[in-house]
């Protein structure tokens, strides 16, 4: 999430982080801060309001260990763990879109039973806005099928679209950079039935399923494996693959 804090220099920020006082004051975590792996990045400093915006990402260490254990039980050796929104950014940055002139005028929207957020990449920095849904609303979205949808589901999509529209409007007003296209990432089986409702509510914005393999030459022996309707489900894995791995151990992390 993006949090707002009093304006600080890099040195002041680092001291506040080292004493744990910064995150305790800005972010309410369910557990002890030591139970998380924390990443942060300053997005914007505003001297007029004496504030700054910080991208805050916290991954629970127990979850990381659990996922690593699952991979090991499958006979795999985990070599890298990353936050999903960052892997999606990597995949987006490295995709050669045929229908988009510049990657800078598009955004990523994740729609799922778990996470729902809009990510706009500004100057190589992800600007993330959460979309707030109650569980019954998530259930209604997952039940949408082809054809007319019921009034309850339509109302949920309308509220969802309003949050997306507000996030885009805030970004465009602040940075004077128009967002024309949204790349949708989703593991929902009915996502192709959901997208038309978003297009209806946001008619001036293009919506399409994110295809991280667009522009990629796929060998014939892998063509069948990747010939699926919704390639956005591959985005996180491909984003990880784009990471520059330190295979020779030159750098110590």
Name these PLM-found stretches.
Residues 91, 208-253:
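Glycine-rich phosphate-binding/hydrolytic loop that grips phosphoryl groups
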Residues 178-207, 213-214:
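Glycine-rich phosphate-binding loops at beta-strand->alpha-helix junctions
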Residues 1-2, 191-194, 249:
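Switch/connector loops and helix/strand junctions flanking conserved nucleotide-binding motifs
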Residues 1-95, 207, 211-218:
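Active-site neighborhood for divalent-cation/phosphate handling
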Residues 29, 165-181:
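Phosphate/pyrophosphate-binding loops at sites that engage ATP/ADP/AMP, CoA/4′-phosphopantetheine
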Residues 46-156, 160-164:
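Small-residue (GG/TT-enriched) beta-loop-alpha framework at ligand/catalytic clefts
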Residues 158, 162, 166, 192, ...:
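Feature representing long, continuous alpha-helical segments
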Residues 7, 11, 164, 200-203:
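Phosphate- and other anionic-substrate recognition elements at nucleic-acid/protein interfaces
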